[in-house]
Amino acid sequence: MALTHLQQLEAESIKIMREVAAEFENPVMLYSIGKDSSVLLHLARKAFYPAKIPFPLLHVDTNWKFSEMIEFRDRIAKEYGFELLVHKNPEGMEIGISPFEHGSGKHTDIMKTQGLKQALDKYGFDAAFGGARRDEEKSRAKERVYSFRDKHHRWDPKNQRPELWNTYNSQVNPGESIRVFPLSNWTELDIWQYIYQENIDMVPLYLAKERPVVDRDGTLIMVDDERMPLLEGEVPMMKSVRFRTLGCYPLTGAVESTASSLTEIIEEMLLSTSSEREGRVIDHDSAGSMEKKKREGYF
């Protein structure tokens, strides 16, 4: 019997995960707590069932994630029983890096990019799973499934290995590593249909709800805690919003929506003509912003 579209994607991702677990000495899964990470975690549990996942999950905590994301992370880790590593850049924490005071570019570089590189060096990981997909953004569209990184964790799009069909090159020298993207060929719609099919638990922020937001240059920013400074005369508005992508709350824009169930989200996706990452402030720091970040070691 022929496999469905989602079954083909699932089989491809599981094969990649098993291959990485067999070929690399010390792999890790980057866990950002979003919908793609939740699908990645579900696939990993399937890939190695009934055994436990044979590698840890790593969350690079910027100290500015939505509070619901952290609550979800801790609950899922406890329920599923996987090894969870949480890393915060100690230098960034010491000087109190903030997206409000220091700007999105500096905050992202210190707390995300440098924080990730610190964690990868600390534990000596030679392969790191990520949930990036090619349909998300143009620099990710040209990234390999096995994305080679040099000893400084930098990505050079001109220095990548050919990938013929489903054959991948896992050879690295000491200090080098591979970022592995099992969801490369999935789309945002595929992700939501798979979440619905498999009944995967996810952060409630993806569902529409009345939330306090402020309009900053056309981007709806949710007031998640008392650390967010309001501008003079600015008053949070209660709007029915949801998030298509999750990150640091001051840098993540909400979309007005009434989609409060998975079926409604899927219906919304079928009509959508915009990228989910339009709400990511960090993607608009400068032209080619995401590619520049990836060259420096970003996810």
Swiss-Prot record:
Residues 276-299 are annotated as: Disordered. Keywords: ATP-binding, Nucleotide-binding, Nucleotidyltransferase, Transferase. SUPFAM superfamilies: Adenine nucleotide alpha hydrolases-like. The keyword Nucleotidyltransferase applies. Pfam families: PAPS_reduct. GO terms for biological process: hydrogen sulfide biosynthetic process; sulfate assimilation. Its EC number is 2.7.7.4. With CysN forms the ATP sulfurylase (ATPS) that catalyzes the adenylation of sulfate producing adenosine 5'-phosphosulfate (APS) and diphosphate, the first enzymatic step in sulfur assimilation pathway. APS synthesis involves the formation of a high-energy phosphoric-sulfuric acid anhydride bond driven by GTP hydrolysis by CysN coupled to ATP hydrolysis by CysD. Belongs to the PAPS reductase family. CysD subfamily. This is Sulfate adenylyltransferase subunit 2.
